[in-house]
Amino acid sequence: YTTDANGEGPSWASSLFEDNAEYGFGMHIGVEALRSRIQHTMEENMDKVDEDIATLFKDWIANRQFSVRTREIRDILVPTLEALNTDFAKEIWDLKQYLIKNSQWIMGGDGWAYDIGYGGLDHVLASNEDVNILVVDTEVYSNTGGQASKSTPTGAVAKFAASGKPVKKKDLAAIAM
């Protein structure tokens, strides 16, 4: 984890298995559960705060899927929460890192995306959740010395496929649409 001058920055996590989709999706679902908890706490306590704070709560709820706006609201809301001496303000303050809508990325190679991890990838795509997926497509299994894979184009010569791959490459981009 590395941070900028504001103490913010990208984080990286990976699993030892070819389950990038499931792992990344689980991280996304976990973050969204915490953000839903923030929203619920705001909604339950809207009538216990002054109008300015209630307006911030409403603004955050209305814009919770927008990174730039949630950052702006967070910058105003966190110092305000620090000044309140209530359990609900402390609960939201404790979850302040989740006030900003993050950008969730799931990354992996073509062996994962086209083959061994395709079931998980298909599940993530079908969920229609707001995650980004990056597939590094070398068109062969790079970790095995270049064997042909489902991402290898028709006719390509690769290790253990010296006469060329006989079937068409899986069209992952079309499947994702």
Regions found by a protein language model. Give the residues of each.
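N-terminal leader/propeptide and maturation segments of large enzyme subunits in energy/redox metabolism
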Residues: 18-91
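Thiamine diphosphate
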Residues: 27-31, 38-41, 85, 91-177
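Terminal amphipathic helices with adjacent charged low-complexity linkers/tails
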Residues: 1-21
